Every structure is written in C-alpha cells, then in structure tokens.
C-alpha cells in the first residue's frame, strides 16, 4: 500500500502555479517543446513568460572568416536564461563582408549584388541588384519598407555623396538627395552612428554630435540637431530604448576615457534636450577597455529596454544596460564567448532582436537548424 501511494505521488502531474514556477527556470529554447506537451502546458508557458520571467532581447553575434569560403557562424546570448547558444544553420551564400547596422539589419554588398536580412534570427536572406553607384563603407539602414544606402567613399560625378533607396515592395532602387553637406567629411560608416524608428533614419557624427534625420517616404532631410551632451564627451553613439532615442557618450578623451554615460533625447518643437539617465560603473568601464589602456569608440545594439555595449577594438566583454521603472539603468556584463585567440581576426557583426517562441519554432521547423548550448 505504501509503495502504491509513493508511486502515485511520484506520478502526480505538475500544474498551475507550480508548473509556471518550474517553467520560469527553463531556458527559452527548451520552452518550445514544453509548450507542445499539451494545451495546459502551453498556457503555463505563456503565463510564465508573461508574469514570472519575461522574454528579453537577444544579442546575436555573427562571425565570418576572412578567407575562402568565408564561412559564417552565429551565436546568441539570451539574458532571460543567462545562456549562450550556437545556432547551427546552412551556410550563408557569400556576397562580400558581412556587416550589421542599427541593431537589426545584416547585409552584404558587392558591385553586383546586395544581400540583406532583418528577421529576428536572420533565417531569411533577400537578394537584390547592387545600388547604382558603388561605394565602400557606406551607411545602410532599413526604415519601414525602404533600405537606405548613403555616403561611403566614391566619386560619382558631381555628387560625392550619392544616396539610394531600395523599395522592398517594388524591388527597385531610386536615387535621391545626398547626405547633408555638414556630414560629407564624415560620410564613412565608421565615423557615423545610425539609428532608426518606423519612419526615419537618424545619422549622428560621433565626434561632434551633429545629427540629421531622413524620411524615405518623402525623401526629406531634417536637422541639424546637436546631440553632443557636453564638451567633455569626445565620442557618442545613438540608439533606441523603449522607443526613445538615447545617446551613449564617452567622457574624457581618446587617450583617457574617464567614464560612460547614457542620456535620453527629448525633442521639442524647435529644440532638443538631453536628460542624463545613468552612468556606467567604473569597474564595467575597465572591463569595456579590455587589454587596451584606451577606449576610443563604443558600439551599441539595442532593442526594447535593453542595450548591449561593446568596444569595437576589444569586443571580449559585453556591457548590458537595462532600463527599468521608466528611466533607471541597471548595469551588468557578460563575457563574449565568440571572442578567442582562434577567431580574433574574423569579422564580427552584432544584431539585437526580440526572439519569441514563434521565431524559435520557425527555426526548429526548418529542419536544418540546431541550438547548441555553449
């Protein structure tokens, strides 16, 4: 009798609040099969993600070798689960160097082809003809149904800064007004920071903070706006957190970075104000520097309320900034598992995505992708 009771206890189903609590500790990649056990389990997974341990934006790090066949690998960090995974997938057809822009866009461009991907896990690649004008190191942005390509280094008639727009609906390129003249001396993407919302592309010159916005629907530039927080900020980048533009600035000078701060951009009818949101703890600033005594640049990948910051010259440490309670900054760091002595010379591209169960289900259903814990 006691053995029967023990057996019944061991086989008792887990349900309700207990099941949701258990599922809140399960990595997101394992919640896909869990949600398919039964309808009650599916409901428990959804409830657990909504109330106990919500999904957080993933950072996805793409690497590409610099020699033929230019193989690519993809790793993703899930902050909800504090877990790195390698995403095994079919090789990406090589067009040129793999690059990323404004957190969500991956692209490759050559004189003949332009390839791009913008879904959360970059499962799908789109191939188009190359822009009319060839240029190296341009700025590239996806705004709504338009891809904008501008700047770079080239010589195109009387217009040194050609600008082209690709319409996703028609599959055609159009030329339009060039970058504002004030940005022409900094037209390469390495000198500019790009951010987008649903209607506009925002371009900031990293040193001066001079910013313009571009609306591809009517091909109109707006600005200039001054987004330099102060004279003690020697380099800054822009992004979006909780649908609000933010500025991340390096304090001091290129030889001696003394700090990193975050500001919210508040735009009025005629002026732009900056409100300080937080300052990175110094121990994280030192991690950001890595082995180098200097911190000359900073890069941002952001989505929702979470920003990932890294040093382009020393990307071994990733700094997390989570905006909570509207405007408070919660700081943390995680080691970039992609960076090691073997692949130190490979090309890195960073994207940030809201990866949900549907995105993971699509990846699993393809049959040729696997998620492997690192």
Protein language model features and the residues they cover:
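CRL adaptor-proximal regions
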Residues: 1-16, 21, 369-374
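Amphipathic alpha-helical protein-protein interaction segments
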Residues: 7-15, 27-34, 156-159
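Short loop/turn motifs that recur once per blade in beta-propeller domains
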Residues: 9-14, 28, 48, 87-95, ...
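Hydrophobic, repeat-rich solenoid/adaptor surfaces of innate immune receptors and signaling proteins
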Residues: 25, 31-37, 148-149, 201-203, ...
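Short helix-loop-helix/strand-helix junction enriched in hydrophobic and basic residues
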Residues: 32-50, 77
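An edge-strand/N-cap motif at the start of beta-rich repeat modules
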Residues: 53-82
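A sequence/structural signal of beta-propeller blade repeats
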Residues: 71, 87-261, 329
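C-terminal closing repeat unit and adjoining cap/tail of repeat-based domains
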Residues: 259-374
């Amino acid at each position: 009798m006691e053995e029967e009771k023990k057996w019944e206890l061991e086989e008792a189903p887990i349900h309700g609040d207990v099941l949701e609590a258990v599922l809140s500790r399960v990595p997101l990649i394992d919640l896909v099969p869990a949600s398919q056990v039964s309808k009650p389990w599916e409901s428990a997974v959804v409830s657990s993600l909504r109330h106990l341990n919500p999904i957080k934006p993933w950072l996805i790090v793409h690497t590409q070798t610099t020699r033929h066949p230019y193989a690519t690998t993809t790793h993703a960090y899930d902050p909800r689960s504090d877990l790195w995974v390698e995403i095994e997938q079919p090789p990406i057809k090589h067009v040129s160097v793999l690059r990323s822009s404004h957190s969500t866009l991956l692209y490759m461009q050559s004189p003949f082809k332009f390839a791009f991907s913008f879904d959360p896990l970059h499962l799908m690649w789109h191939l188009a003809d190359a822009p009319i004008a060839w240029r190296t190191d341009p700025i590239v942005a996806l705004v709504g149904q338009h891809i904008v390509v501008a700047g770079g280094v080239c010589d195109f008639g009387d217009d040194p800064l050609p600008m082209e727009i690709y319409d996703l609906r028609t599959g055609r390129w159009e030329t339009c007004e060039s970058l504002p003249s004030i940005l022409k001396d900094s037209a390469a993407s390495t000198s500019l920071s790009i951010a987008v919302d649903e209607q506009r592309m925002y371009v900031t010159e990293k040193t001066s903070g001079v910013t313009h916005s571009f609306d591809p629907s009517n091909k109109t530039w707006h600005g200039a706006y001054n987004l330099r927080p102060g004279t003690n900020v020697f380099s800054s980048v822009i992004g979006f957190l909780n649908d609000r533009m933010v500025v991340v600035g390096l304090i001091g000078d290129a030889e001696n970075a003394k700090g990193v701060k975050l500001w919210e951009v508040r735009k009025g009818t005629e002026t732009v104000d900056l409100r300080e949101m937080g300052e990175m703890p110094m121990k994280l600033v030192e991690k950001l520097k890595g082995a180098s005594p200097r911190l000359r640049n900073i890069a941002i990948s952001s989505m929702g309320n979470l920003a990932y910051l890294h040093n382009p010259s020393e990307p071994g440490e990733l700094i997390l900034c989570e905006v909570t309670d509207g405007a408070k900054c919660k700081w943390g760091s995680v080691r970039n598992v992609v960076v090691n002595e073997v692949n130190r010379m490979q090309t890195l591209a960073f994207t940030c995505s809201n990866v949900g169960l549907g995105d993971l289900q699509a990846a699993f259903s393809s049959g040729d992708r696997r998620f492997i814990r690192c």
